Amino acid sequence: MTGDGMRLARTFLASFLVLLLEIALIRWMPAYIRLLSYFSNFILLASFLGIGIGCLLAPTRSRLFRWFPLVQAAVIAAVYWFRLELSVPTAGSIYFSSGTAEKVVLVESTMLLPVLFVIVAALFATLAQRMGREMAGLPPLRAYTANLAGSLAGVVTLGVMSWLELPPTVWFGVAFAAALPLLFTADQPAAEPAAQGAMGAPRPALLRGVVVTPLVGINVALLAGSLVLVSVMARGAIWSPYYKVTVSQKGPDTVVEVNNIFHQSMAPLDQKEYFYEWPYSAFGDTFDNVLILDAGSGTDVAAALRHGVKHVDAVEIDPSIIRLGRELNPDRPYSDPRVTVINDDARHFLRTTTRKYDLVVFALIDSLTMQSSFSGVRLESYMFTVESFANVRDRLEPDGVLVVYNYFRERWLVDRLANTAAAAFGEEPRVHVHEARAFLGVLMAGPRLAQLTAPPRIPDQVTAFNQSHEPSPARMHQRDPAIEPASDDWPFLYMRDRHVPQHYVVALAIVLVVSALSVVAALRVLGRGTTGGSAGWSWQFFLLGAGFMLLETKSIIQFALLWGSTWVVASVAIASVLTMALVANAVVARKSVTRPWLVAAVLVGLLALNYVVPIGRVTFESRAAESIFYALLVFSPILCAGLLFGSAIARSTAVSRDYGINLLGAMVGGVGEYLSLVTGFRALVVVIALCYIGAVAARVRETGVRQEVRVGG
């Protein structure tokens, strides 16, 4: 293999390792550090900062990659020794804690998150410097193509491992194997000569660049030790595509925990809370067809079967929870021939099914995790929007009813759901709550409420796993209409109102300060200063990165609305974005981009179309036609963005530096996503458009003249 061929292979391998490890950490760390299930975006931002800094430092003589095994071992050891439960002192948003304070160290989130941010950023800086050096030794477009291909391979590999439900030992084992060839080859700036043998003679082709030193041996041992520690931590757990799942027996209950938090318990129906059977207590055994969303291990299904329903569709997103329900639920509901178990996202099923139901149950829907690493939306957020409740209304029979029950924890959350139901159904829902039981509430809405002329007495006793048996009288709930319902544009169910929580503000401010200082330090190491107009900085690449990160986030959210919030959809969405970037790169390699302003104008026009045509606005009789229409709507801006970046990188005289600046911009774009907590997601389209307009303006300013870009691939 030629020198360029070897460098191309190492670029691919380094890019593969970077993205594989990035997604692996985003999945693995929240399984032990609880709050990261809701703040996984911080790991993503840290990785972008580290990759950006590492690429900026690619031309320097320092060899950061030699520290990669040690830093990775430190990250894994820190998670092992300090499995932290974070307290978030706020009533303005809801986070779920494990209730196992005796087993964890309590720390304040705004102090720990920046520490984790720095450690993870340092890890990716060691990797990215090596990746940047390999890219710098190649023609710009070939380097970027290899980078995209390696990244795509990383996404696909972890997706396959998730599909197979393989444990983290395998994830990190694949990363270990990918790191070995890089550890055993020379790590040097592209401008330095190839490694030589004794007395200055060139090495044989097969051994050229191969390095074997005591340090390499130590690093291999560190990687092996890290792998052993990961294996020890994963022992006894089931790794579903969404969580670390553990099962234990506590008295008569089989308890399921996900990411160290109580998720559900399995016990005979007679020992469970009354609300499972409340719809049948209120309306009698009059339901024929029932839909249960988030069916879990099957208790809600068992209740429906006890009361004589003819058919139950049980929808559950997590295949491992379904298996546990089949094997361990003492009532064996999933073995009943009247039950159809559907492994799907509940909102996607609502949008795509044509069946009608007498009863739709939202069964204790709490995901305890995020939709994807690229957004702050929780997995279940789109189930509790006005649009989702409208989907339920359309799936009800003329005398059907929706029932929602849960431990809502705050009064304002009950108000939000009641207001959402009122907006979707056009009539008042019926809601009762037990304030002394974490606002346990039952909400009913739909035309069958008109039949409830003499409702039964609500039980005072709430029998629940690991809770007090003291009486807790219920009261009817009068909703506060001032609490805003959640919508597909603003789906933040667990936030009282539109604001950026203070703990986010503090943590993000620290993150931005750390990032700014890191960039300044990196630029000074390069000897290029930090003042505006410095030759070492490109606002074009920075704005392209910020815009693309926001565009990717928007696209993944649109994907979830259209095809569901499953891990498959999230993986396909990320892979599709990378594929579109590869397609754009191929186009640029074959045809010059002579009018970047024209491409930007088309991009802005497509963004405007995305703004005025949200997912679901245009309906089709054919699901295939709907999918094609919205796929084109979502992906066409990404193609234009890829053309702009591809044409810019083709003209770069320092590809690793400009790619690093681009990743730093992406990190800032990730911070900008938190604006959606105030504005909603549609408003981000305006920010994306401004980023790309600014990038094209910066391109003209930085080059001094608009010129045709000709690329020889």
Residue ranges and their predicted role:
Residues 1-713:
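Alpha-helical transmembrane segments of multi-pass membrane proteins
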